[in-house]
Design a protein with these regions (language model features):
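Active-site-adjacent structural elements that line small-molecule/cofactor binding pockets in enzymes
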Residues: 1-351
Length: 351
């Protein structure tokens, strides 16, 4: 297998896509999803906080700490408006501006969105921003996409809430064609193009697109039109069934590996022996039981555990240090120079 390479910092920038690298060599995918084993990602902001708005104290330092600690990826949120009833504003800052900062302040960690609300943004704006981050980061971007689950946002943007599933499909198709073709002809309900092109093009043949939840789409459609699935933390048996179905639908794509990731809220307790206690979409647990849970998730086929620290009662800097010493060495990121661990190792259970 050809080894993936990150573009040289001294090379000309191929903004027109004349020398795009194969998608199979994508370094963002390689680090986040080596295949056959689980990695760990972090969802911004990396802090525990009450209420909907984080303090953002040391927010960039925590991400840099996570990169040094061995997190495979960091995921930024797209929350344009504060809805007090929803209780979460993500990292507050615009995701594309924040990712621009992250391209300059990190070196190797995969940069993801979890997720861009496609119906609320014109696909040309999304494509331009995504390709720009992709180029500036050396191909580290993974685009998590969503239909949108906050009803208050749609009328604010002049959008019909009930039509968001259709608009999502239209936006994703538009996004794909303008990034994957030169001077494309576009005739979409969202716009028309002829005789013009969108630059820059991505570093690799395409930007990986990962679906968040179902997005009011059929699972088969998700399997056919995206490169992976970001899901929540249902009971173990349900998650195993979800993954089995996902593998069934994606295993025929010419051997292409399409990862399945799980987002989980974590409150890592001071007591390393504390047994797991359910919290909102996650667990309060000591590191010993956490390690056992993570091994079980890996066995059923979870390709990445995406940790949300919002409910952490301890300083997240301390939590990251503890994970770095006792947990992350068991789930290291993929090596950018050695993608292709997609064959499940002997002894791995699950689908």
């Amino acid at each position: 297998m050809t080894e993936p390479t990150v573009p040289s910092a001294g090379a000309p920038v191929d903004v027109e896509g004349e020398e795009q690298r194969p998608f199979s060599e994508h370094p963002g995918m390689a680090r986040a999803y080596p295949g056959g084993r689980m990695t760990v990602g972090a969802i911004t902001p990396l802090e525990g906080f009450d209420g909907p708005v984080p303090s953002l104290a040391g927010h960039m330092e925590r991400i840099q700490q996570a990169e040094r600690a061995g997190f495979a990826s960091v995921w930024v949120r797209d929350v344009p408006l504060l809805d007090p009833s929803f209780g979460d504003t993500g990292q507050v800052f615009d995701p594309w501006v924040y990712l621009g900062q992250l391209t300059a302040r990190t070196t190797s960690i995969t940069l993801g969105t979890a997720s861009i609300v496609m119906p609320l943004r014109h696909p040309l704006h999304t494509a331009k921003a995504a390709a720009s981050v992709d180029q500036l980061s050396g191909g580290r971007l993974l685009l998590g996409v969503a239909t949108g689950d906050r009803p208050v946002e749609f009328p604010a943007f002049g959008q019909d809430l009930e039509g968001r599933a259709t608009r999502f499909r239209q936006a994703l198709a538009y996004f794909r064609v303008v990034l994957e073709h030169r001077f494309p002809h576009v005739d979409s309900p969202l716009g028309r193009m002829a005789g013009t092109d969108l630059l820059p093009k991505p570093v690799y043949q395409r930007i990986p697109v990962l679906m968040t939840g179902h997005g009011r789409q059929d699972v088969r459609w998700i399997a056919d039109h995206t490169d992976g699935w970001l899901y929540y933390t249902p009971p173990l048996q349900q998650q195993a069934a979800n993954i089995a179905r996902w593998r069934e639908l994606t295993q025929g794509d010419g051997g292409a590996f399409k990862p399945y990731a799980q987002a989980t809220y974590l409150d890592l307790t001071e007591d390393p022996l504390a047994l797991p206690r359910p919290i909102h979409q996650g667990f309060s647990v000591g590191r010993v039981s956490l390690l056992g849970m993570m091994r079980t998730w890996q066995e059923i086929g979870v390709d990445q555990l995406m940790i949300n620290f919002k409910h952490s009662r301890r300083p997240v800097a301390d939590v990251i240090d503890e994970l770095a010493e006792h947990v992350l060495p068991h789930f290291p990121p993929g090596r950018v120079g050695a993608r292709g661990e997609h064959e499940r190792p002997a002894g791995r259970a699950g689908p």
